[in-house]
Amino acid sequence: MKFKGKSMTNMQKVTILSFDEVYLSDEICFDKQEQRIIGPCKSAQVVMARGLFSDWKQPIYFKFDQAMTKGILFEIIRKVEPYYSVVAIVCDMGASNQGLWKSLNIDWNNNNFFPNPSDNEKKIYVFADIPHLLKLVRNNFLDHGFTIDNSKINSQCIQYMIKNSNTDLKVGYKISQYHLDVKQAQRQNVKVAAQLFSH
């Protein structure tokens, strides 16, 4: 990245860091190059740097069984900042990341940024991962429904639409009982959540 950055404009170097825990099988493997056994590990924290105004991305950090912390995040930013301009971070709203947001004094009502650890005059904005938010909204809709203008709408409305759609005029195209019956791992499927709210 350091070498590539020399040929980029300042605009191309505007960077967002996205990170997530990737869940792994808990098997062990042997690293031939390092001559050591790796695992078993439950997850890997992976950080990706990507251009905001240009089409590039690069994995820059990974560590097994490691939640993101303020210290790790600041260390990564300090290593990237001499060559690129970090303006935002993006992550899901899992419990460990909610703890990170709290340690950065991020809250929805008052503060959506923190000072850049390399330059306190610069701000780094914090965004929730949109696919994760979409799944959370869908799950909340299925579990509790929404209240809009003092009226409750819930999955029973969708159920009624599915039941009363006929073959000549299908109101909820591609919506089926499957979209309402998602359980466990199926609740992590972004495509199914997007389909439910797209009709």
Residue ranges of predicted features:
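Structured nucleic-acid-interacting core domains from mobile-element enzymes and related host factors
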Residues: 1-54
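Non-catalytic regulatory appendages
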Residues: 59-199
